[in-house]
Amino acid sequence: MTETPQRTRPLRVLAAMSGGVDSAVAAARAAEAGHDVTGVHLALSANPQSFRTGARGCCTIEDSRDARRAADVIGIPFYVWDLADRFREDVVEDFVAEYEAGRTPNPCLRCNEKIKFAALLDKALALGFDAVCTGHYAQVILREDGVRELHRASDMAKDQSYVLGVLDDRQLAHAMFPLGDTVTTKDEIRAEAERRGLAVAKKPDSHDICFIADGNTQGFLADRLGKAEGDIVDEAGNRLGTHEGAYGYTIGQRKGLRIGTPAPDGKPRYVLDISPVNNTVTVGPAEALDVDALRAIKPRWCGAAPTGPGTYTAQLRAHGGETEVRAELVDGTLEVTFSEPVRGVAPGQAIVLYDGTRVVGSATIASTTRATAGAA
């Protein structure tokens, strides 16, 4: 477990336990390291589907029971905290509003920013806890001058620093990631859970948006925003088909387009632009998705903000690769230029900047510039 100044003595640690294997092993490691650990499961959903057997996500009653059983095996106190109202306001309503505006949000990143390391952390500190522990794969590393840095996990294949890139210095000072500094496969984590007697050792990972129980994002949005039929057009404005709500699409999407005829060249079409004002979805060839620059707003820095232009690597989606960029903060907006064109960048997603393995900061993508023409 990576050390910080506060980690040199036993801490009172609140372990966020989702009911999955990663958070259970993280809590067990924190307890084994000598910390005074208390487990907590966050009740985040008022959706009745979350209470049915087999519901997917990480907010179900079964997950709460799994977390409690794991805490019992570890030998730590356990509580369930109801943060459903805060989660609905800060994550679910934001998710719907962003899609309605033609953007593609990342609810996991938003949850880390507003729930796990804000609502949960604030309550933990008020109750006298020193740190919040989660099962994320990332590292908080202490420099010689006492500054804490957020770094990628030792195992790049499982690194989750992207969804933690919104954390600021205060939040990092109270963050603990016991899984981040070990190079182990998921099978090894499961084997460790089994050795510890944790029943979640064989529990499948959840890859769905936790508050959409059936995994149907378009249906979830339609229930809240209603159907709004509009046109699907090509770049010349020719009508190719219709949709039931522009909010149901994202930049780069290929599947689910209701287009009756193929492109003249026979190649697939992709979503290039979403106009909530006109309720229009524009489609075109894959190469039209290439962008060479973007503007990003609401920057958050893990440490001091850069004082001038710099060269970094950037990650644009949770499971995406790295790309080299030139970035500069101009009047509070992050101006980014790619060394090579990047395909399918969606406004609303986060760009996270890295200096080696260190997270420099993040911002929300507001607009992009096509590699061949004007703004996307």
UniProtKB/Swiss-Prot annotation:
EC number: 2.8.1.13
Pfam families: tRNA_Me_trans, tRNA_Me_trans_C, tRNA_Me_trans_M
Cellular localization per UniProt: Cytoplasm
UniProt record, GO biological process: tRNA wobble position uridine thiolation
Alphabetical list of Gene3D superfamilies matching this protein: Adenine nucleotide alpha hydrolases-like domains, HUPs, Translation factors
Signal peptide feature range: none
Disulfide-linked positions: C111-C210
One GO CC term on file: cytoplasm
Reaction(s) this enzyme catalyzes, per UniProt: S-sulfanyl-L-cysteinyl-[protein] + uridine(34) in tRNA + AH2 + ATP = 2-thiouridine(34) in tRNA + L-cysteinyl-[protein] + A + AMP + diphosphate + H(+)
Region (Interaction with tRNA): 158-160
Binding-site residues, ATP: A16, M17, S18, G19, G20, V21, D22, S23, L42, G135
Residues annotated as transmembrane: none
SUPFAM superfamilies per UniProt: Adenine nucleotide alpha hydrolases-like
Site (Interaction with tRNA): H136, Q349
CDD domains named in the record: MnmA_TRMU-like
Family annotation (InterPro entries): MnmA-like, MnmA-like_C, MnmA-like_central, MnmA-like_central_sf, Rossmann-like_a/b/a_fold
Family named by the database record: Belongs to the MnmA/TRMU family.
Biological function: Catalyzes the 2-thiolation of uridine at the wobble position (U34) of tRNA, leading to the formation of s(2)U34.
Protein name per UniProt: tRNA-specific 2-thiouridylase MnmA
Gene: mnmA
